[in-house]
Design a protein with these regions (language model features):
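Extracytosolic ligand-binding ectodomains
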Residues: 2-478
Length: 478
């Protein structure tokens, strides 16, 4: 690539970031509005931290430490959970210490141990919603960020002098389950805020419930554009798909100079469809062409459709996968055999993708909100996370850490639902966190852009290939 095109790409990327942060979210605000909700006083008949009066269908998916939600619990972990259920908190802490010595990378045990240290002390309660059964690896990534944030907050004096208690909620990443859980959280007056959900489809399903119940939710991972401005009670610490799509389209057209792109997506998934549509809009605006579109969710999907795409002039592939179509996405990557560059959304930032595709993954360029090796990251957070989890953490861990830290900072002045909402809406509200300053546009979107990562041979993932920050020729991450 020429030095001139390097310069064009860098200038364009900066301009796009400025326009997106300052413009798109504000336009969405003007178009969609954020409806005022009627007053509603939550019921005090349930308590998710204790399981009091919870329906059995919900009780089995909620835990502050009295039951294990994630599969494959060790004997020590099972014993510690039983100790919490019996109110023997000191013993629970001791046994959790043993469990974490054997498996230091287990955030569920980490959170339960922190809760056991609080015991029956008055605390501020936040619910963290993550899939424990199905998409388990993603759920664990989310919980690592929440667990590390809880530890940091409590070590530094808590929230308004009170410790932070986290309640883990497994919504199975299913809209029907998530809406029932959201209603339960709204009705529990002890829960002052929610961190979640995972997929954009699930978050979209729960938004009306949180708005009606006037309960703030901060999602650390849902990126669909449709979430921008949808409710005054929804915020996110992750950029919307507009930022990822712009970064990927700019890379394809102005850096690789690939004007013709074939797109793969999941027609059944809101996030996938959102990223696809945004990407197409930017490609069209910048003079490129979408030569073909293929649905990864089709029962008879065949990666050999790439031959048709190339016959029609495709110079690059873009994969907007969902969590349900990662296997098909891996098939596309493997079939490509590095013939064409492949662009992807953050769902492809996944160790399983690297493992399944091996050297074929070297064609990948992926847009993500954060990377621990990128220039300007919070080295303190990176060091602490490595010490805590004995390994590298993903962007999902970092943005979840942001969400919990942000919610705690907003609650510090007034640890109530109303106080949280007022603080987050303040024009001068800003919190320094793992991925940088956190503040929100009127749409609830964060003022942040995505960055690009590429695959190179490496050891960090344990499968021989790693995601590393993309650097424009002649620049350095140092």
């Amino acid at each position: 690539m020429s030095r001139e095109n390097n310069s064009r790409f860098a200038i364009l990327a900066t301009l796009v970031a400025f326009l997106l942060v300052g413009g798109i979210s504000l336009i969405l605000w003007a178009v969609t509005g954020r409806l005022d909700s009627a007053e509603r006083i939550p019921s005090q008949s349930t308590n998710v931290a204790t399981g009091n009066r919870l329906p059995e269908s919900i009780r089995s998916k909620v835990s502050a430490g009295e039951q294990v939600l994630f599969p494959e619990a060790s004997e020590d972990k099972t014993e510690a959970v039983e100790a919490i259920a019996q109110g023997n908190y000191a013993n629970a802490v001791t046994v959790f210490n043993s469990a974490l010595e054997d498996n230091p990378n287990d955030p569920e045990s980490f959170i339960y141990r922190s809760n056991a240290r609080i015991a029956d002390e008055e605390a501020v309660t936040i619910a963290v919603v993550a899939p424990a059964n199905g998409n388990t690896d993603i759920g664990l990534e989310i919980l690592r960020g929440a667990a590390q944030a809880q530890s940091t907050i409590n070590r530094n004096g808590g929230i308004d002098g009170m410790p932070l208690r986290l309640v883990i909620v497994d919504d199975r990443n299913e809209p029907e389950v998530a809406t029932a859980i959201a209603q339960t959280l709204v009705e529990d007056n002890s829960v002052v805020g929610v961190v979640g959900h995972y997929s954009s489809d699930v978050t979209l399903a729960t938004v009306p419930i949180y708005e009606e119940g006037e309960l703030v939710a901060i999602t650390p991972v849902s990126t669909a554009v449709e979430l921008s401005g949808i409710s005054p009670y929804l915020y996110r610490t992750v950029p919307s798909d507009s930022f990822a799509a712009a970064a990927l389209a700019a890379y394809a057209i102005f850096y690789e100079e690939d004007l013709n792109v074939a797109v793969y997506f999941d027609a059944q998934d809101e996030l996938s469809a959102s990223l696809k549509e945004e990407f197409i809009s930017f490609v069209d605006a910048w003079g490129g062409t979408i030569v073909e579109q293929y649905d990864l969710s089709r029962a008879n999907f065949d990666p050999r459709v790439q031959r048709e795409a190339q016959q029609n002039g495709a110079q690059a592939l873009m994969i907007a996968a969902s969590s349900n179509t990662l296997e098909s996405a891996a098939d596309v990557i493997n079939y490509n055999k590095r013939r064409l560059p492949i662009l992807g959304g953050d769902e492809l930032y996944n160790r399983n993708i690297l493992e399944a595709t091996g050297p074929d993954s070297l064609a990948l360029t992926v847009a993500v909100p954060w990377h621990l090796l990128a220039r300007g990251v919070d080295e303190g957070f990176v060091t602490a996370s490595r010490q805590t989890w004995e390994g590298d953490v993903s962007w999902r861990t970092a943005t979840t850490y942001d969400a919990v830290i942000t919610m705690a900072a907003a609650l510090d002045e007034a640890p109530t639902r109303e106080g949280l909402k007022q603080a987050l809406d303040s024009s001068d509200f800003t919190v320094e966190s793992a991925t940088g300053p956190v503040n929100f546009l009127p749409s609830g979107d964060r003022r942040q852009v995505d960055r690009l990562v590429q695959v190179q041979p490496g050891r960090r993932s344990g499968v021989g290939y790693d995601f590393v920050p993309f650097v424009v020729d002649g620049e350095s991450e140092e």
